Amino acid sequence: MIGRLRGVLIEKQAPEVLIDVNGVGYELQMPLTSFYELPELNQPTTVYTHFVVREDAQLLYGFITKQERSLFRLLIKANGVGPKLALTILSGMTASEFVGCVERDDIVTLVKLPGVGKKTAERLLVEMRDKLKSLMEASVGSEREFVLQSNYSPAPVVNSAEEDAISALISLGYKPPQASKAVSAAFKEGMDSETLIKAALKSML
């Protein structure tokens, strides 16, 4: 089991990152809420991980805090929710926003996420209510608890920010026309791909 990685961030293109740990490169997938908090390339970083072994692949999922990882682990235990959908949920909203949806029985917001239908949303609200309560109690005293206060600083604008943003949204489960429309509507001159992804996601919720 790989529970944490500390190394140098050498590649990042949402939602995937590559971290060099003593000469070994680890590929991870991260929810965008965690991805936004990564440092610039070639800077040291620490991420908490969840390791998934399948017949055809071994996958690492990365998170900035233990609480975010704990929520991911609760999500994948819910009926009908696998790692991919859990990653999509935590990319579409922060952990605190998800907790708020559960507390308010907010199905309307949940079903706007790709891959989350009405039945899945209803199951999540029922199954997660008690689990989230205990998780939040356990996180009391944590530096950030469930509030994600990003210290993200946009990287210099790169070529094809729109293409990168569309690609990231498609990888999260959005259909290409839907992703393209959202990115085009959210794009403003000077935006880097990460800021554009965040704006496009916000416009769809």
Curated annotation (Swiss-Prot):
Query: What role does this protein play?
Result: The RuvA-RuvB-RuvC complex processes Holliday junction (HJ) DNA during genetic recombination and DNA repair, while the RuvA-RuvB complex plays an important role in the rescue of blocked DNA replication forks via replication fork reversal (RFR). RuvA specifically binds to HJ cruciform DNA, conferring on it an open structure. The RuvB hexamer acts as an ATP-dependent pump, pulling dsDNA into and through the RuvAB complex. HJ branch migration allows RuvC to scan DNA until it finds its consensus sequence, where it cleaves and resolves the cruciform DNA.
Q: Which key words are in the record?
A: Cytoplasm, DNA damage, DNA recombination, DNA repair, DNA-binding
Q: Which InterPro entries match?
A: DNA_helicase_Holl-junc_RuvA_I (IPR013849), Hlx-hairpin-Hlx_DNA-bd_motif (IPR003583), NA-bd_OB-fold (IPR012340), RuvA (IPR000085), RuvA_2-like (IPR010994), RuvA_C (IPR011114), RuvA_C_sf (IPR036267)
Please give the residue ranges the record annotates as the region Domain I: 1-64
Question: What organism does this protein naturally occur in?
Answer: Shewanella oneidensis (strain ATCC 700550 / JCM 31522 / CIP 106686 / LMG 19005 / NCIMB 14063 / MR-1)
User: This protein's superkingdom?
Assistant: Bacteria
- Domain free text: Has three domains with a flexible linker between the domains II and III and assumes an 'L' shape. Domain III is highly mobile and contacts RuvB.
Q: Where is this region: Domain III?
A: 157-205
Q: Which family does it belong to?
A: Belongs to the RuvA family.
Listed under subunit, the entry gives:
Homotetramer. Forms an RuvA(8)-RuvB(12)-Holliday junction (HJ) complex. HJ DNA is sandwiched between 2 RuvA tetramers; dsDNA enters through RuvA and exits via RuvB. An RuvB hexamer assembles on each DNA strand where it exits the tetramer. Each RuvB hexamer is contacted by two RuvA subunits (via domain III) on 2 adjacent RuvB subunits; this complex drives branch migration. In the full resolvosome a probable DNA-RuvA(4)-RuvB(12)-RuvC(2) complex forms which resolves the HJ.
* Coiled coil regions in record: none
First-listed, main subcellular location of the protein, grouped into a coarse class = cytoplasm
**Entries under SUPFAM superfamilies matching the protein:** DNA helicase RuvA subunit, C-terminal domain, Nucleic acid-binding proteins, RuvA domain 2-like
One GO BP annotation is: SOS response
Q: Where is this region: Flexible linker?
A: 144-156
Keyword DNA-binding found? yes
Q: Where in the cell is it found?
A: Cytoplasm
One annotated GO molecular function: four-way junction helicase activity
Keyword DNA-binding listed? The answer is: yes
Stated name of the protein: Holliday junction branch migration complex subunit RuvA
Q: Which NCBIfam families match?
A: ruvA
Species lineage, top-down? Bacteria, Pseudomonadati, Pseudomonadota, Gammaproteobacteria, Alteromonadales
GO terms under cellular component: cytoplasm; Holliday junction helicase complex; Holliday junction resolvase complex
Which parts of this chain are annotated as the region Domain II?
65-143
In terms of Pfam families, this protein maps to: HHH_5, RuvA_C, RuvA_N
